[in-house]
A protein has these predicted regions:
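Divalent-metal coordination cores built from histidine and acidic residues
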Residues: 1-109, 114-122, 126, 144-187
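Divalent metal-coordination and catalytic microenvironments
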Residues: 10, 41, 78, 100, ...
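Short glycine/serine/threonine/alanine-rich loop segments
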Residues: 11, 103-105, 157, 225, ...
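Acidic/histidine-rich helix-loop elements
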Residues: 48-64, 129-140, 197-206
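Active-site neighborhoods of metal-dependent hydrolases
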Residues: 70-88, 134-253
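Acidic, glycine-enriched loop/beta-strand segments at the rims
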Residues: 237-240, 255-261, 271-306
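Short aromatic-centered micro-motifs
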Residues: 309
Length: 323
C-alpha cells in the first residue's frame, strides 16, 4: 500500500472491503503506531464466497455449518466489515449477515437483491460481477429503473458507485487531460495517462453509457439514499482515481459538489460507524483536514489544489510527501 500517495491526495482514512486479513492487520497496526506513513485503515479479510470461488484465496462457504469459523476470525482480527461475494448462495449469505450482525460487524455485497432482503448494509459498484450473469442494479445500457432507487433509498443500504472502473475514468481523461498535469502524477505514476484512449468514433456511445450509469448515485441521493465514495483501487491509480471519481459524479452524473464532498467525508464516516470521531470538523473530533487553494463547492476540480493535509493533528505538505 502506498500510504504516502494517499496522503498526498488528501485521503486520511480508507475503507477496504476485501484483502488479505493479516496484511490488513499489519497495515492497520503499523500505521496506527506511527511506524508507517499512511491513512488509517478500516479493513477486513478476503471476500466470503461460495464453494466455486470467483477469485483465488478467498474463504469458501458451501454450507451454513462453515460460517462460525469465518465469523470467529472476523471477531478475533477485529474486522470493520465483511464483504460477501459473487458465488455465495443466497441462503448462506443470509446466515453470514445474521452472524456478522450478532457481533456488530456490517456486511456489504456486490448485489442489491436479494442482499437487501437478507439485511446487507451496503452494496459495492453500480455494476459489479454476479453469479447470475447480469447486474441487479443497471441494465446492459447502464440504465437503472425506479425499483433499484426505491430499494436503496428505503433500505438505507450504502452504495459505493465506483463509476471510474466502468469507463468514467477514461472519459475524464479524454475530456479533461489536465488531470494528469499534476506533480503527484508525474512523481508517483507518470504512466497514468497511457492506455486511456477512447477512439473518436466511440466517444458519443461511451459518453452516453457513462452518463446513464452516473445518474444512479444522484437519483439515490435525491430519493433519500446513501452514497459513499470509493474507487476499487488499484484498478485505477491510487488517489488519482478518487479525484477523477468525484469529478465524474459531478460532470456526468449531476451530483452537486457538496453531495460528493459529503459522500467522501461525513457520510462515509457515519456509514462505517465512526461519525462521532472522523469526517467532520467539530470540537472533540480527530483532527483530519485538507487545505486547498480553491473552493471545491464552486468547482469540484478544486480538490486538486491540495497543498497541505492533516491526519490526526499531524500537518504534512504535499511537497514533502512527494519526496
Amino acid at each position: 500500500m502506498s500510504g504516502r500517495v494517499y496522503l498526498a491526495y488528501g485521503v486520511t482514512s480508507i475503507r477496504n472491503p476485501t484483502g488479505d486479513p493479516y496484511e490488513m492487520m499489519e497495515l492497520r497496526e503499523s500505521i496506527g503506531s506511527g511506524r508507517r506513513m499512511g491513512p488509517r485503515i478500516f479493513g477486513t479479510g478476503n471476500s466470503v464466497d461460495g464453494s466455486r470461488i470467483y477469485y483465488a484465496g478467498v474463504p469458501t462457504l458451501g454450507s451454513p455449518t462453515e460460517i462460525p469459523l469465518e465469523i470467529k476470525r472476523a471477531e478475533l482480527l477485529e474486522y470493520d466489515l465483511i464483504k460477501t461475494y459473487v458465488r455465495l448462495s443466497d441462503g448462506v449469505q443470509k446466515e453470514v449477515i445474521k452472524s456478522a450482525h450478532s457481533i456488530g460487524i456490517p456486511v456489504t455485497s456486490h448485489e442489491l437483491y436479494p442482499a437487501v432482503a437478507n439485511g446487507a448494509d451496503g452494496v459495492e459498484h453500480v455494476r459489479g460481477t454476479s453469479r447470475r450473469g447480469y447486474s441487479t442494479k443497471v441494465s446492459e445500457l447502464n440504465r437503472s429503473y425506479q425499483d433499484v432507487i426505491d430499494l436503496l433509498a428505503v433500505s438505507g443500504m450504502t452504495l459505493t458507485p465506483t463509476i471510474g472502473i466502468y469507463g468514467a475514468y477514461e472519459l475524464v481523461a479524454v475530456d479533461d487531460p489536465t488531470i494528469f498535469d499534476d506533480p503527484r502524477v508525474t512523481s508517483f505514476f507518470p504512466e497514468a495517462a497511457l492506455g486511456h484512449y477512447i477512439p473518436p468514433e466511440l466517444l458519443p456511445a461511451s459518453r452516453k453509457l457513462v452518463e446513464n450509469m452516473a445518474s444512479l448515485p444522484k437519483r439515490v441521493v435525491e430519493n433519500g439514499g446513501v452514497i459513499i465514495m470509493g474507487t476499487d483501487t488499484p484498478i485505477n491509480p491510487r488517489g488519482l482515481s478518487l479525484i477523477s471519481e468525484m469529478q465524474a459524479l459531478v460532470d456526468y452524473g449531476g451530483m452537486t459538489p457538496l453531495d460528493v464532498m459529503r459522500a467522501s467525508t461525513s457520510i462515509a464516516a457515519e456509514a462505517m460507524g465512526y461519525g462521532a470521531e472522523i469526517g467532520s470538523v467539530k470540537e472533540g473530533m480527530i483532527a483530519d483536514l485538507i487545505l486547498l487553494d480553491e473552493n471545491p463547492l464552486e468547482d469540484i476540480r478544486a480538490v486538486r489544489s491540495l497543498r497541505w493535509v492533516m491526519k490526526g493533528g499531524e500537518l504534512l505538505s504535499v511537497k514533502e510527501l512527494l519526496h
